[in-house]
Amino acid sequence: MVKFCPKCNNLMLPKDGKLKCAVCGYEEETTAEGSKEYEYKEHLENKKEKITVIESEGLETLPTTRIECPKCGHNEAYWWLQQTRCADEPETRFYKCKKCGHTWREYD
C-alpha cells in the first residue's frame, strides 16, 4: 500500500515504525500490523555497463577539444557523450587522444 503526505502530497516512506515524508518532515504513526504493510526494501542489481568504443574510422566527424591526454600529454582529443548511468543522471563525456588514441571518460 502506498501512502502520500497529507501536507505536501509526496510519498511517505517507512522509518523507525513510522511513515515519514522526506520532503516536509511530516510523520505518522503506524500500527504493528500496518508497519509490515509499509516495509521498505531496496533491491540492487549488479549491472554491467555496456560502453561503445569509437574505432578510428569515423573519428574525423567527431568534435575536438583542447584537453590534456593523461597518457601522452598531447593537448587535443576527440569527444562524445553517452548515457552510461540512469536516465536521471547526466551523460558521461568520453575523450580519445588524437595522438596516441588513448580513451578516457569524465563524469559531470
Swiss-Prot record:
Functional description taken from the UniProt entry: Induces RNA cleavage activity in the RNA polymerase. In its presence, the cleavage activity of the RNA polymerase truncates the RNA back to position +15 in a stepwise manner by releasing mainly dinucleotides from the 3'-end of the nascent RNA. The truncated RNAs are able to continue elongation. Involved in transcriptional proofreading and fidelity. Misincorporation of nucleotides during elongation of transcription leads to arrested elongation complexes which are rescued by TFS-promoted removal of a dinucleotide from the 3'-end.
Recorded superkingdom: Archaea
UniProt-recorded name of the protein: Transcription factor S
InterPro entries named in the record: DNA-dir_RNA_pol-M_15_CS, Rpa12/Rpb9/Rpc10/TFS, TFS, Zn_ribbon_RPB9, Znf_TFIIS
GO BP terms, alphabetized: DNA-templated transcription; regulation of DNA-templated transcription
Positions contributing to Zn(2+) 2 binding: C69, C72, C97, C100
Similarity remark: Belongs to the archaeal RpoM/eukaryotic RPA12/RPB9/RPC11 RNA polymerase family.
Keyword Amino-acid biosynthesis: no
Annotated GO MF terms: DNA binding; DNA-directed RNA polymerase activity; zinc ion binding
